[in-house]
Amino acid sequence: MEKLSLCLLVIISLSNAFAQTDMIGKAFVFPKESENSYVSLTARLTKPLTAFTVCLRVYTDLNRDYSLFSYATKTQYNEILLFRGKTAVYSISVGGADVVFKPHQSSEPMHFCMTWESTSGITELWVDGKPMVRRSLKRGYSLGTQASIILGQEQDAFAGGFEKNQCLVGDIGDVNMWDYVLSPEEINTVYAGGTFSPNVLNWRALRYEMSGEVYVKPQLWP
């Protein structure tokens, strides 16, 4: 009986850890520097990605390096990475290659959308509804599906290799991902609070697990 109860408890715990949750109006809060505080997201992926759009909001006053979105596979830790450097530049990595953008800086919550397509390699970064000059990388590449997706830390190993000096301190929310490139009109609609049925990560039906000191709190942006 005790073994049966223990098994049921484990099953319930795992079920709760990755249950779908509507996160509208909420944000993940990372209140202090840590090498073991992060959120792991579970994606719906059935085939290699040849395009993507990732959108999210971040509120932080950090002036150092930090990771906004980290998607790693066992063969490539920077399969997808959105990273802010200490010189106020933002880099997008795909398959270990990266391009750099330098958008405006703001003390307000910032909205980011990054897109990439394999056919041309065209890579875009949108900040608060405004596009940066397009770049190109990893033309013809396909992204692996057996992924570890982490918020709050950069992965220097699959689901690990975290460094305290690259962690996020602040809030992150409205995280959505599609397996195609959204149009400029769609990106601006997402920036304004709309959505287009995200089919990889959906903030309205998010599967996640928090580790360390991370909290779910009401969002601080409209």
Swiss-Prot record:
Main location: secreted
Pfam families: Pentaxin
GO molecular function list: complement component C1q complex binding; low-density lipoprotein particle binding; metal ion binding
CDD domains named in the record: PTX
Keyword Metal-binding: yes
Role according to the record: Displays several functions associated with host defense: it promotes agglutination, bacterial capsular swelling, phagocytosis and complement fixation through its calcium-dependent binding to phosphorylcholine. Can interact with DNA and histones and may scavenge nuclear material released from damaged circulating cells.
Name listed for the protein in its UniProt record: C-reactive protein
